[in-house]
Regions:
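Short beta-strand-loop/turn "lid" adjacent to the catalytic site in phosphate-handling enzymes
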Residues: 62-101, 105
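Conserved phosphate-binding catalytic cores of ATP/NTP-utilizing and phosphoryl-transfer enzymes
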Residues: 1-4, 109, 113-138, 307
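A contiguous, well-structured pocket-lining segment that forms one wall/lid of small-molecule binding clefts
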Residues: 192-267, 273-284, 288-291, 309-316
């Protein structure tokens, strides 16, 4: 029996994540430690996020150790930057890089580095078992609190190359969700609570047509509309349902525009906002879409582990 194991590490602005995988691609562990955010606040400064990653890392590595017992660590991958473009940088990823370098210095494991965004894309491919996407061009949406981008994606080596073709021109989808949630008294991050509120609403959802410029859009208007709706109605469920209906309409419109220009396309959705069942069900009924389970849509290290597995095997 092969006892070799691969590790992935991701230190985003929300979660410290470590994943372990066998050298034949079987997931052993998907470990996460969320970063604490004070009640009423809407996120963390980068310096605070890095501090909490450093604080979280020993305990999450202790949890990982349980899965490493009797096994040999042969490769460690890490997300070292937000996106696969020159100059992409966020201090929070230094926490993961430091952990990886420490492991590489004390073991014979090989090291690999990727972008956080490539990790998200790979996590969805791995979770949905859509490995056929490595042989074709597809469109990926990275929807989170820090990013709302529409990308044309192709395979490049062990990972991906991507071209930014659309997305938000102001607020990110996750930002809007969190701002409205906190405004209504929900805890940060507010996505799960806001989704529960939306699903509890049984009435007709008022619709407001979003303004789309081919593949680009603005979401600050949604924040203003939702806050006014809540001020006028004091109805959390109605407001939550409106928010997710609006976001679904935005994504539906840009997907329609893309297919009008390029023909039938596979649309992949990653990032924490992509775990929302309302958005998923709306788009699933209209397009060829790829979603992963919520645990692989939100920040995780499974995508990084899977990319590391792929890179390690390509070198053999």
């Amino acid at each position: 029996m092969n006892n070799e194991v691969i590790m992935g590490i991701d230190t985003s602005n929300y979660t410290t994540s470590v994943a372990l995988m066998t050298v034949d691609g079987q997931l052993l562990a998907n470990l996460k430690a969320p970063l604490p955010v004070k009640e009423g606040e809407r996120g963390l400064r980068q310096s605070d996020a890095l501090f909490f990653h450093v604080k979280n890392m020993p305990s999450i590595m202790d949890r990982a150790k349980e899965f490493l017992n009797g096994k040999k660590l042969v490769a460690v991958g890490v997300s070292e930057r937000p996106r696969n473009v020159e100059g992409s940088y966020m201090p929070c990823f230094l926490g993961g890089v430091a952990a990886q370098k420490s492991i590489l210095a004390t073991t014979e494991a090989k090291g690999y580095s990727f972008s956080h965004q490539c990790g998200h894309i790979m996590a969805v491919i791995y979770g949905a078992e859509r490995f056929d996407l490595f042989s074709k061009k597809f469109v990926a949406f990275h929807l989170s609190g820090g990013t709302t981008e529409m990308l044309e994606v192709r395979e490049s080596g062990s990972a991906f190359s991507s071209q930014l073709i659309g997305g938000t021109e102001d607020l990110n989808a996750g930002q809007v969700i969190d701002r409205i949630g906190v405004y209504m008294g929900l805890s940060f991050p507010a996505g799960c609570e806001l989704e529960k509120a939306a699903l509890a609403y049984k009435g007709k959802v008022p619709r407001k047509k979003p303004k789309i410029k081919e593949y680009a859009f603005n979401l600050s208007g949604l924040e203003n509309l939702a806050k006014k709706m809540y001020d006028d109605t004091n109805d959390k469920n109605l407001t939550a349902a409106f928010v997710f209906d609006y976001l679904s309409s935005v994504l539906e419109d840009v997907c329609n525009n893309y297919e009008a220009n390029n023909g039938k396309t596979v649309f992949l959705f990653g990032g924490g906002v992509s775990s929302n069942s309302i958005i998923k069900n709306r788009l699933k009924s209209k397009f060829d879409v790829v979603f992963a389970e919520p645990g692989l849509s939100a920040d995780n290290a499974v995508g990084i582990a899977a990319l590391t597995y792929r890179a390690h095997n390509l070198e053999k």
